Design a protein with these regions (language model features):
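Residue-identity detector for glycine
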Residues: 21-23, 48-52
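Bacterial N-terminal signal peptides that target proteins for export
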Residues: 27-40
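Conserved functional acidic sites
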Residues: 54-259
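Intrinsically disordered, low-complexity cationic segments
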Residues: 5, 33-36, 254
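Bacterial N-terminal signal peptides
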Residues: 39-48
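Cationic, low-complexity basic patches in intrinsically disordered or flexible, solvent-exposed regions
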Residues: 11
Length: 259
């Protein structure tokens, strides 16, 4: 899901009102844990979706999840995991369509939901990824189990850069969206050493934003970085009941269920 593999983040000079003041917007995302380690942990994920101490230098990479509590279908306030739900974001001739498919895939012993992302520029396909998610029936936290990626050039697949799966080559699942996002929460979204190590920090929980699809309040703003690319920094913005509003310069133009 991360677009870091294509280019360095571009600063998007769009003012965004947050509960911390006025900021600028940009983008990024993801994380992982072996099935053998999907056991009980100390603190409930509902309280920020994390366990373990949080300091300025640490990012949570262990999550208190029981295997039986994970499902392939559900609805987090900021992340809809229901078949047929689609988000379409655009910026000029750039387009991103995110669709929750009817398909599921077992990854690291867990049945996950397949979410397809199709990125295009000028009508030409740039990337198609099949992302694998599961949601906790207990906390509504959504976990990320990996992705299969096809990178296109001139209509042909040229590589699969960025692909990873939890349980393969030391990769572990990560947290894509806490059931109850708390200001300042820091966690890994992807844990695939050397391939994908995206991490997130919640920097605002009460923003407002206007996009082509409408005006939204209680907007969640997440800053994403990766230790694999020092200095890279992007932002994603989410609205309750809808999901992703903005990613870099891409802004939501349409959302809803498709048949």
């Amino acid at each position: 899901m991360s677009r870091y593999r294509h280019a360095l983040p571009q600063l998007v000079d769009r003012l965004f009102l947050t509960d911390a003041g006025i900021g600028t917007t940009r983008r990024m995302i993801m994380a992982t844990i072996p099935h053998a380690h999907i056991t009980t942990a100390a603190l409930a994920i509902a309280l920020g979706g994390m366990t373990g101490a949080q300091t300025e230098q640490t990012w949570t990479d262990q999550f208190g999840v029981e295997p039986g509590e994970l499902a392939s279908t559900g609805r987090n306030p900021y992340f809809v995991l229901e078949p047929g739900y689609r988000l379409t974001l655009e910026d000029g001739d750039e387009r991103l369509a995110v669709t929750v498919l009817a398909d599921t895939k077992v990854v690291d012993g867990v049945e996950t939901r397949v979410v397809e992302e199709r990125e295009s520029e000028g009508g030409e396909l740039v990337e198609v990824s099949r992302n694998y998610f599961a949601i906790s029936k207990r906390t509504n936290s959504v976990f990320y189990f990996g992705e299969d990626v096809d990178i296109y050039k001139n209509g042909k697949v040229v590589n699969h850069e960025g692909s990873w799966l939890a349980g393969v080559n030391g990769a572990r699942f990560g947290l894509i969206m806490p059931g109850l996002p708390l200001l300042g929460g820091r966690y890994y979204q992807e844990i695939a050493p050397g391939i994908a190590m995206d991490r997130a920090q919640i920097v605002s929980t009460n923003g407002t934003l206007k996009v082509p699809a409408g005006s939204f309040t209680t907007v969640l703003r997440i800053e994403e970085t990766t230790p694999l690319e020092r200095g890279a920094r992007e932002y994603k913005l989410y609205a309750p009941g809808v999901g992703l509003l903005q990613e870099e310069s891409l802004r939501l133009v349409q959302h809803g269920t498709v048949r």
